Amino acid sequence: MAAVLTFLRFLGRGGAVTRGLPGGARCFGVRTSPTGEKVTHTGQVYDDGDYRKVRFVGRQKEVNENFAIDLIAEQPVSQVGSRVISCDGGGGALGHPRVYINLDKETKTGTCGYCGLQFRQQHH
């Protein structure tokens, strides 16, 4: 599906061909601006006359294609036995402050506010 979307981008925007895509189609990969410049995860892209493009004269802007929000969304929901779980992001210098998440709420799935990992209580 991603290859089809990329091919259709080259054909043009708003044409008869692009209307045939399903409504829930999602693009994967790095987005590019109309000038061909890569767009970062924050949507940063410079105009042609912007003085900040001086940094990239003679070379391409390097953009990490693995956005953290996409990598976290791919993680499965962790099943735990208790109704309160603590998340420290992996511990040590690579983690975040420990937070406690209640899993007996209406949502039934708890999400860590720091790292985005999701937890669900496994009922016996």
From Swiss-Prot:
It is found in: Mitochondrion inner membrane. GO terms for cellular component: mitochondrial inner membrane; mitochondrion; respiratory chain complex I. InterPro entries: NDUFS6, Znf_CHCC. The keyword Transport applies. Transmembrane segments: none annotated. Disulfide bonds: none annotated. Accessory subunit of the mitochondrial membrane respiratory chain NADH dehydrogenase (Complex I), that is believed not to be involved in catalysis. Complex I functions in the transfer of electrons from NADH to the respiratory chain. The immediate electron acceptor for the enzyme is believed to be ubiquinone. Belongs to the complex I NDUFS6 subunit family. This is NADH dehydrogenase [ubiquinone] iron-sulfur protein 6, mitochondrial. It comes from Bos taurus.
